[in-house]
């Protein structure tokens, strides 16, 4: 008796088990979030329904910038290979959206064929029509970098109303569609001719819900001198501050991202360090992909909940028979008050609400009589998903991350800076003398010996107290000096001989020059007398 009650209760008690995070997200979306979206026509207002490919696709990087800022050259620099459909020049060359992806052979897949392929995450782009699809293609080629990530090249953004209208499709809406699904958005600026056009400002504003994905690259920085570069950097930060309304400062990478010689090499070290940081950021994307998809699903669920409250509130206010049109106009005009009412009644943050102006525009064309009343069961299901299922998936995300290397992207420009003499920081700081036959500390040892013999050595060694008197003269914090002591006391006897003292002074010099100390003493820094005993 009442077997259906016990069955339902059992289903609630027993959490669903998933093999992977992607599978879990796919099932949760289809079973718990999609019914809410469909019931309140979410897809007509915000974003098309997600498909299997959206949960399984590789991390994607979206490049956005004005024409001739080096977007296509940047991709060429990363993968170290020309790709089909690539055009580079000072004039606006890239006139299409090009998805650069891995494939067994080189070739181009046109947009109309791409949007019918269920294995690709682009099927919902058919909503933008032929004008867009004729300007969309996939360049596929066998390349080790593309094994781990895909890159989206975009048309250069131009200034002027004529350019915006002549595209034939809503450029900002297409970018917003991609922004929802990519893992990283890179905005490129040309340091030599810094300018943010009106259309570029609109595009950046369209990406405002995805600030966590945005990184900025100030490209072609080798074309200007240090003093000018400082001014350009300041001007860029000031301009971005007016467009991106967040209290946090967006991360800006400065460099020259191509394989040609630097025109003005003054800032070579800065460019190398910045390039290394950007590469590390891109290399972390495969490891963080599952977390990004989880985060995006949570954002989508919160928006879907708010949307359900908005639509059901409008339905509740509509008359049954007369005066529907006049009431509709009144409700659209007073949508801000409805937002405030929902915010108060359901304790929802104002940041979860969609853009008021955009929502008002979309509601003008809708038939309010087809809207649905509030259905608490659908909302309860989504709340349960956010409270319980997502927490379980979070544990799986951490497990999957721990099994992946921190730098998963290999090949192309990423291999050039990994190891060897041209790796970042090779032969500098604690790495100085790594390839020398002689002990690198030896050249300064006579100077250090003079100090050593003034510190009252006993049996050729000085105590920690005597060493401390000399080491604190460097004015380095005790935490740093403590680490240097541990590294220099190679035989761990609590005393320093002349070689160990010289090593301690060498490490102090390394730190004072602005380099980091190694976690363990590199083999080339071990004093010669200690090597024989190993």
Swiss-Prot record:
Superkingdom of source: Eukaryota
Gene Ontology terms for molecular function: ATP binding; calcium ion binding; GTP binding; identical protein binding; small GTPase binding
Region feature G5 motif, mapped onto this chain: 243
GO biological-process terms attached to the record: cellular response to nerve growth factor stimulus; cholesterol homeostasis; cilium assembly; endocytic recycling; endocytosis; endosomal transport; intracellular protein transport; low-density lipoprotein particle clearance
Tissues expressing this chain: Highly expressed in testis. Also expressed in kidney, heart, intestine, and brain.
Alphabetical UniProt keywords: Acetylation, ATP-binding, Calcium, Cell membrane, Cell projection, Cilium, Cilium biogenesis/degradation, Coiled coil, Cytoplasmic vesicle, Endosome, Membrane, Metal-binding, Nucleotide-binding, Phosphoprotein, Protein transport, Transport
Domain annotation Dynamin-type G: ranges: 55-286
Annotated region described as G1 motif, given as residue ranges: 65-72
Residues binding ATP: 65-72, 220, 258
G2 motif, as annotated region: 91-92
N-acetylmethionine PTM sites in chain numbering: 1
Limits of the EH domain: 444-532
Entry annotated with the keyword Metal-binding: yes
Keyword Magnesium: no
Modified residues (Phosphoserine): 355, 456
Renumbered residue ranges of the record's region G4 motif: 219-222
Coiled coil spans: 198-227
Classification via SMART domains: EH (SM00027)
One cellular-component annotation, GO: perinuclear region of cytoplasm
Free-text function comment from the UniProt entry: ATP- and membrane-binding protein that controls membrane reorganization/tubulation upon ATP hydrolysis. In vitro causes vesiculation of endocytic membranes. Acts in early endocytic membrane fusion and membrane trafficking of recycling endosomes. Recruited to endosomal membranes upon nerve growth factor stimulation, indirectly regulates neurite outgrowth. Plays a role in myoblast fusion. Involved in the unidirectional retrograde dendritic transport of endocytosed BACE1 and in efficient sorting of BACE1 to axons implicating a function in neuronal APP processing.
Quaternary structure, from the entry: Homooligomer, and heterooligomer with EHD2, EHD3 and EHD4, ATP-binding is required for heterooligomerization. Interacts (via EH domain) with MICALL1 (via NPF1 motif); the interaction is direct and recruits EHD1 to membranes. Interacts with RAB35; the interaction is indirect through MICALL1 and recruits EHD1 to membranes. Interacts (via EH domain) with PACSIN2 (via NPF motifs); regulates localization to tubular recycling endosome membranes. Interacts with PACSIN1. Interacts with RAB8A. Interacts with FER1L5 (via second C2 domain). Interacts with MYOF. Interacts with ZFYVE20.
Family of the protein in this entry: Belongs to the TRAFAC class dynamin-like GTPase superfamily. Dynamin/Fzo/YdjA family. EHD subfamily.
Designated name of the protein: EH domain-containing protein 1
Gene name in the database record: Ehd1
């Amino acid at each position: 008796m009442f077997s259906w009650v016990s069955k339902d209760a059992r289903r609630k008690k027993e959490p669903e088990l998933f093999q992977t995070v992607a599978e879990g997200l796919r099932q949760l979306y289809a079973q718990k979030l999609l019914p809410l979206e469909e019931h309140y026509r979410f897809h007509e207002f915000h974003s098309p329904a997600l498909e299997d490919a959206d949960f399984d696709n590789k991390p994607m990087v979206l490049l956005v910038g004005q024409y001739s800022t080096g977007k296509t050259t940047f991709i060429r620099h990363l993968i170290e290979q020309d790709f089909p459909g690539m055009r580079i020049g000072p004039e606006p060359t890239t006139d299409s959206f090009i998805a650069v992806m891995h494939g067994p052979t080189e070739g181009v897949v046109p947009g109309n064929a791409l949007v019918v392929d269920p294995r690709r995450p682009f099927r919902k782009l058919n909503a933008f029509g032929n004008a867009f699809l004729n300007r969309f293609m996939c360049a596929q080629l066998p390349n080790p970098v593309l094994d781990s990530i895909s890159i989206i090249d975009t048309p250069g953004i131009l200034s002027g109303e004529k350019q915006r209208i002549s595209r034939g499709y809503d450029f900002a809406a297409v970018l917003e569609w991609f922004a929802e699904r990519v893992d990283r958005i890179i905005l490129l600026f040309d340091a030599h001719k810094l300018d943010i056009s009106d259309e570029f400002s609109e595009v950046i504003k369209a990406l405002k819900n995805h600030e966590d994905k945005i990184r900025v690259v100030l490209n072609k920085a080798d074309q200007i001198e240090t003093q000018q570069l400082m001014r350009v950097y300041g001007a860029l930060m000031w301009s971005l501050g007016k467009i991106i309304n967040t209290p946090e400062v967006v991360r800006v990478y400065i460099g020259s991202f191509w394989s040609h010689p630097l025109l003005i090499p003054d800032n070579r070290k800065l460019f190398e360090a910045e390039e290394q940081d950007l590469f590390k950021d891109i290399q972390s994307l495969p490891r963080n992909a599952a977390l990004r998809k989880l985060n995006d699903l949570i954002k989508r669920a919160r928006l879907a909940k708010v949307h359900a409250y908005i639509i059901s509130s409008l339905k509740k206010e509509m008359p049954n028979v007369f005066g529907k049109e006049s009431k509709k106009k009144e409700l659209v005009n007073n949508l801000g008050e409805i937002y405030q009412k929902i915010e108060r009644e359901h304790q929802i943050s104002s940041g979860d609400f969609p853009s008021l102006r955009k929502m008002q525009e979309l509601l003008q064309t809708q038939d309010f009589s087809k809207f649905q009343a509030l259905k608490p069961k659908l909302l309860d299901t989504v709340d349960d998903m956010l409270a319980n299922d997502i927490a379980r998936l979070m544990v799986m995300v951490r497990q999957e991350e721990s099994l992946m290397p921190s730098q998963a992207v290999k090949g192309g420009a990423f291999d050039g800076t990994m190891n060897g003499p041209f790796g970042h920081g090779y032969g500098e700081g604690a790495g100085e003398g790594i390839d020398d036959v002689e002990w690198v500390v030896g050249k300064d040892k006579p100077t250090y010996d003079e100090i050593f013999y003034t510190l009252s050595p006993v049996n050729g060694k000085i105590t920690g107290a005597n060493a401390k008197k000399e080491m604190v003269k460097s004015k380095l914090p005790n935490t740093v000096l403590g680490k240097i002591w541990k590294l220099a006391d190679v035989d761990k006897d609590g005393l320093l001989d002349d070689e160990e003292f010289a090593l301690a002074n060498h490490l102090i010099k390394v730190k004072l020059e602005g380099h980091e100390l190694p976690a363990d003493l590199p083999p080339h820094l071990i004093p010669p007398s200690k090597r024989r005993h190993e």
